[in-house]
Amino acid sequence: MENILDYNEAELKQWMDKNGEKTFRAKQFFDWIYNGTFDFKDMKNLPQSTRERLEKNFYIGMPSVVKRLNSKKGDTVKFLFRYNDGNIIECVVMKYDYGNSICISTQVGCRMGCSFCASTIGGRVRDLTSGEILAQILKAQKEIGERISNIVLMGSGEPLDNYDNVIKFIRIVNSEKGLNIGQRHITLSTCGIVPRIYDLMKENLQITLAISLHASDDETRKKIMPIANRYSISEIIDCCKKYSDFTGRRITFEYSLVKDVNDDKESAKKLGELLSGMLCHVNLIPVNTVNETSYEKPESSKIKKFCDTLLKYKIESTIRKEMGADINAACGQLRRNYIEESEGK
């Protein structure tokens, strides 16, 4: 049996036609889904025979809520979701003045091996389908009772390691027949799989591309990100310049600041020289504490100096505001803790 959420409207129309149903029933079905109705039986404007046929051939792959944590400030909600096969992922809703943003997962676990990230501990279990990625937004919207208007593909998993499902998901949520979320309200974060960035460029999307750089030289990057053994920083920067020229979009470079690893003035100068003249922005992220590592965030004064050094190279940077620290809102932390508790560790 298939997850009907893996179908877009055009595909479901084809299925309806092939199975003797009126094609407009596909739109009716998705109207119910996008308005928070996740049971065939409750879709009252679909004939009973249609509902029964759908139920016989499909299931609505909506995850169940394992855990919901609300931050004390009320600006962050973190969910642990369980899919039909028992696999667990997490997503985070962040509430801003301009609307609600959601950070979603694209894989169960991750195989990229970045040493500062909890998501990669235990490796990659499997890819999420386009429908399973979509379901995170639909379920979160229903849980909080508010619309989500911004999407960040920055949860567990490497989006470009699950390329086809992620691209299909983006096109579904961007479609007027889907959630109608503008492409410029969607950010895709990657550790830098160069061939896939070129593929993404050819999709001609207007999403924001965010590169998890986290170092300004290959030697340092190799210590914290295994992907650096495959693609050098110079290859990534060259690729990003071409991507930006082709799409006209500014690139975001993410840089996790780790005390005594990549937070010194020399690292900031190298980063400034590397990105000078590019249409880009740097997002500085004081590293989150992960029990399995000894990494610590630098002092505030050192973070500010790093920022000031980049400014000398005319590179705009922001220091990411910490949200949901009291609920383990950083990528992979809650899932990891839950798995360890379940295993009695």
From Swiss-Prot:
Reaction proceeds by a ping-pong mechanism involving intermediate methylation of a conserved cysteine residue. The gene is rlmN. Specifically methylates position 2 of adenine 2503 in 23S rRNA and position 2 of adenine 37 in tRNAs. Gene3D superfamilies: 1.10.150.530, Aldolase class I (3.20.20.70). Its EC number is 2.1.1.192. The keyword Methyltransferase applies. [4Fe-4S] cluster binds at residues 110, 114, 117. Its cofactor is [4Fe-4S] cluster. InterPro entries: Aldolase_TIM, Elp3/MiaA/NifB-like_rSAM, Methyltransferase_A, RlmN_N, RNA_MTrfase_RlmN, rRNA_lsu_MTrfase_RlmN/Cfr, rSAM. S-adenosyl-L-methionine binds at residues 157-158, 189, 212-214, 288. It comes from Clostridium acetobutylicum (strain ATCC 824 / DSM 792 / JCM 1419 / IAM 19013 / LMG 5710 / NBRC 13948 / NRRL B-527 / VKM B-1787 / 2291 / W). Binds 1 [4Fe-4S] cluster. The cluster is coordinated with 3 cysteines and an exchangeable S-adenosyl-L-methionine. The keyword tRNA processing applies. One of its GO terms (biological process) is rRNA base methylation. One of its GO terms (molecular function) is rRNA binding. GO terms for cellular component: cytoplasm. It catalyses: adenosine(2503) in 23S rRNA + 2 reduced [2Fe-2S]-[ferredoxin] + 2 S-adenosyl-L-methionine = 2-methyladenosine(2503) in 23S rRNA + 5'-deoxyadenosine + L-methionine + 2 oxidized [2Fe-2S]-[ferredoxin] + S-adenosyl-L-homocysteine; adenosine(37) in tRNA + 2 reduced [2Fe-2S]-[ferredoxin] + 2 S-adenosyl-L-methionine = 2-methyladenosine(37) in tRNA + 5'-deoxyadenosine + L-methionine + 2 oxidized [2Fe-2S]-[ferredoxin] + S-adenosyl-L-homocysteine. This is Probable dual-specificity RNA methyltransferase RlmN. Its main location: cytoplasm. NCBIfam families: rRNA_mod_RlmN.
